[in-house]
């Protein structure tokens, strides 16, 4: 299944990792900014864990993403 949940999680995780990298943050720094453990950021970025929309918004805020199209 090319568009199953696991594939979508990995794609979202890769996009979030790229945004974090563009913000010049390590996963540990990003985790501290949002009050999580680094392992949670890592699990989200690898697609090993699902992510709630509210958590995505927290990360986007931490990464300074203001583009409304990226935030959808």
Question: Predicted regions: what is each one?
Answer:
Residues 23-42:
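Short alpha-helical DNA-recognition segment
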Residues 1-22:
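A short, Lys/Arg-rich alpha-helix, primarily the initiator
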Residues 17-18, 28, 57:
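Residues within the helices of the helix-turn-helix
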Residues 20, 31, 60:
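The alpha-helix within a helix-turn-helix
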Residues 55-63:
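Hydrophobic micro-packing sites on short alpha-helices
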Residues 14, 24-25, 51-54:
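Residue-level signal for the short linker/turn that defines the boundary of a DNA-recognition helix
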Residues 50, 62-72:
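Interdomain hinge/linker segments and adjacent boundary elements that couple functional modules
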